[in-house]
Amino acid sequence: MVKLRLKRCGRKQRAIYRIVAIDVRSRREGRDLQKVGFYDPIKNQTYSNVPAILYFLEKGAQPTETVYDILRKTEFFKEFRISFDKKRKEKQES
């Protein structure tokens, strides 16, 4: 199974995260399938490669909660009515 998750880059005390498509069984710093964006929490900048993200989501990739929140802030899911909210609601009820 493939997930969209964050991969840490940068220096000490100056983290930058890449949004990558990666196999679930790989470590955080493991080999990724493709880089699909980045997130800089200090400058609060994001970049996302929309066609690549859509490709992986159509193939069944699941974003982690953090990646989901980052993409939601960039209004990615408003344009492409993708229903991940059902799963999040079920988690909150449990």
From Swiss-Prot:
GO cellular component terms given for this protein: chloroplast; mitochondrion; small ribosomal subunit
Coarse class of the protein's main subcellular location: plastid
Cell compartment(s), UniProt: Plastid, Chloroplast
Gene3D superfamilies: 3.30.1320.10
Signal peptide positions (record): none
Top-level taxon: Eukaryota
Single Gene Ontology BP annotation: mitochondrial translation
GO molecular function: structural constituent of ribosome
Keywords attached to this entry: Chloroplast, Plastid, Ribonucleoprotein, Ribosomal protein
Pfam families from the UniProt entry: Ribosomal_S16
HAMAP family xref list: Ribosomal_bS16
Family membership noted in the UniProt record: Belongs to the bacterial ribosomal protein bS16 family.
Identification of the protein by name: Small ribosomal subunit protein bS16c
Annotated organism of origin: Phalaenopsis aphrodite subsp. formosana
